Regions:
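Fe-S-dependent hydro-lyases/dehydratases of central metabolism
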Residues: 1-166
Length: 166
């Protein structure tokens, strides 16, 4: 629903030249549905950069604002330095506010655009798990070779946690 609203706001418009709009779909399924519904093309045509569905923005990787710069974020990761810039001004906002602000170049209230239309969600959401690798059967686990470069170390062996934490 959020991506439908964002596409509605951006349709036929161009992101402000002083703004870098990056969109990170939450999963490969969301990205596929955005493509199927024409949303992806609308976002790209408006000037949005589409990021890989992976741990990126929420771990502070990529799209770091300049020192003292402002960044609007629509995901729930917000603490000092999380954006990758220790003195960045990071604001948590709705996708609608982020999209409209990307057009204007400043913090803008999307209600200025008027009422949003009623969006109809698909009856069925696509699920495509073809890239998920399931664990080997237990009887074959000893045969699985984990390939590591010289800078990747295995997890340290630790004792099980106690039943309670004091």
């Amino acid at each position: 629903l959020d991506m439908m609203k964002v596409a509605h706001i951006l349709k036929g418009k161009t992101v402000n030249p002083d703004v870098s709009l990056a969109i990170a779909p939450g999963s490969k399924q969301v990205l596929n549905m955005m493509a199927d519904m024409g949303i992806l093309g609308t976002l790209i045509a408006a000037g949005a950069r589409i990021l890989e569905s992976a741990c990126g923005p929420c771990i502070g990787m990529g799209q770091s604002p300049n020192s003292g710069g402002i960044s609007l974020r629509t995901f729930n990761r917000n603490f000092l330095g999380r954006s990758g810039t220790k003195d960045g001004q990071i604001y948590l906002v709705s996708p609608e506010l982020a999209a409209y602000s990307a057009l204007t170049g400043y913090l803008s209230d999307p209600r200025e655009l008027g009422e949003m239309p009623d969006f109809v969600l698909p009856e069925k959401f696509s699920v495509n798990d073809n890239m998920i690798v399931l664990p080997a059967p237990e009887e074959e686990m000893d045969k699985v070779e984990i390939l590591r470069g010289p800078n990747i170390k295995p997890f340290p062996e630790t004792a099980p946690l106690e039943a309670t934490i004091k």
